[in-house]
């Protein structure tokens, strides 16, 4: 028995993914709280267009910050000659410049994400909408990628509050279907992205071939990576027993077995080992790891667990 297996009597289908109404997606109170937040990145990214993100750079801007010794290759226009006259040493002016950040929202939409109420995909979509809203109100660029057996769909990075509605429309049309090949899909998105940024990957990570090499593709391109691991309450604590017929939701493989206390204990032990493996990988590669059970309200998860990590 694996977390990806389903009991055939349960009517989980892609049609169960509810359409998302942009007018009722979030309460005005939650949106007001999101407006006071910004994206938090552990790396500095040089963008094409200035946003509202402040970073320390040498060169021209609106606010002087500090000096540092001149280095080979520095632009002589930013040498402070008055300091040179006093100290007989070359120093370059530093300014607070504006940093442009691109938020990459990467969603696993394979068939295993169509489980639970809400489904894991529905939860990921609402979460992506919340993070995207924060990006838009801060004039950051926000893009979306959808992975299944490969990189299936995408919404090109865009900027501005007016883009929130179109992004929600795109998100609401995503359907969970097909097998999972996370490594291939994630690698394809990382390689196609023109420039790195803050990547938030949302998945249940239920791929027998793993996910690690796909995530490494983002690290190799110098993305700041956060992994949001979605699990349904029933996957954490299965409550079924007896003679069952299980069907793999992605491959269609059928397995009949009797579930007793020993089988449930074995399942929980394997799940624990799986979660420890994921956490260990993320810790070793300095990836932000955030596990969420989908009965946790999206608003609570965003404001209590992501604030101070993905959001500031």
Explain the meaning of each model-derived region.
Residues 2-158, 198-203, 208-209, 213-217, ...:
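An amphipathic, basic-hydrophobic helix/alpha-beta surface used to engage anionic
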Residues 62, 76, 98, 162, ...:
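Charged, alpha-helix-enriched surfaces in structured cytosolic catalytic cores
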Residues 126, 130, 180-187, 276, ...:
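Short, contiguous clusters of charged residues that form electrostatic/catalytic patches at enzyme active sites
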Residues 163-197, 209, 231-232, 236:
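Von Willebrand factor
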């Amino acid at each position: 028995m694996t977390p990806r297996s389903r009991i055939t009597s349960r009517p989980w289908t892609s049609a169960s993914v509810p359409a998302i109404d942009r007018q009722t997606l979030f309460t005005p109170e939650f949106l007001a709280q999101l407006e006071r937040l910004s994206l938090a990145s552990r790396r500095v990214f040089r963008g094409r267009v200035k946003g509202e993100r402040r970073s320390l750079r040498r060169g021209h801007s609106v606010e002087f910050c500090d000096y540092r010794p001149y280095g080979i290759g520095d632009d002589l226009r930013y040498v402070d000659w008055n300091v040179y006259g006093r100290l007989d040493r070359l120093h370059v002016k530093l300014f607070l410049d504006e940093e442009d950040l691109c938020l990459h929202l990467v969603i696993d939409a394979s068939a295993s994400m169509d489980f639970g109420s809400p489904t894991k995909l529905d939860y990921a979509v609402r979460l992506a909408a919340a993070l995207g809203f924060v990006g838009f109100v801060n004039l950051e660029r926000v893009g979306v990628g959808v992975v299944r057996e490969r990189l299936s769909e995408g919404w090109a990075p865009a900027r501005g509050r007016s883009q929130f509605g179109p992004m929600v429309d795109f998100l609401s049309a995503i359907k969970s279907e097909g097998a999972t090949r996370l490594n291939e899909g994630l690698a394809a998105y990382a390689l196609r992205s023109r420039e790195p940024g803050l990547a938030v990957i949302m998945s249940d990570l239920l791929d027998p071939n793993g996910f690690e090499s796909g995530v490494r593709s983002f690290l190799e391109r110098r993305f700041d990576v956060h992994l949001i691991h979605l699990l349904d309450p029933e996957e954490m604590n299965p409550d079924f027993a007896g003679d069952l017929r299980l069907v793999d939701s992605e491959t269609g493989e059928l397995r009949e077995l009797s579930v007793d206390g020993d089988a449930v204990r074995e399942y929980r032990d394997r799940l624990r080992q799986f979660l420890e493996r994921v956490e260990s990988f993320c810790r070793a590669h300095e990836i932000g790891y955030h596990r969420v059970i989908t009965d946790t309200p999206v608003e609570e998860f965003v404001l209590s667990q992501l604030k101070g990590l993905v959001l500031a």
